[in-house]
Amino acid sequence: KYAIFGLHKNYTPQYIFDEIKSVSNIKFHLFEDLILQTHQGKMAAFNSQLEFINKQPFGLELDCDAIINFPSSAQSPSGFALNMVRNFLQLTSEEKNCKYLHICEAAPSSASPVQVGKALSFFITDFIKEPYK
């Protein structure tokens, strides 16, 4: 199974959507469909993606291009807020079948190396720390 959360419709070619829709074990949520949802609505949608894949071992890929104004290979003025992404990571870390985190597309520049490094360290610690009790 494969789940895609926050896929940007405007940057995804139609042939990719055609392929995704032809495979029954792929589920996706478009970013554009999530924009007007509340924080709780976004978390519920993310949780439904987790429920789709969490019955067997899985990994989480965090594409930094999906984070608003994050220095990345395809930086965008539209995306998830950093703290929302941290919430997604914390929720995922509670899944016993989540075996790895892959962070990709971060592209620190000379203007932002410290901020990118801090964000990446937040992502890692959010993913590996024990839940608050």
Regions found by a protein language model. Give the residues of each.
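Catalytic cores of soluble, metal-dependent hydrolases
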Residues: A3-F5, Y15, E19, V23-K133
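Residues in the short beta-alpha loop(s) of Rossmann-like NAD(P)-binding domains
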Residues: H8
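Conserved ATP-utilizing enzyme core subdomain
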Residues: Y11-P13
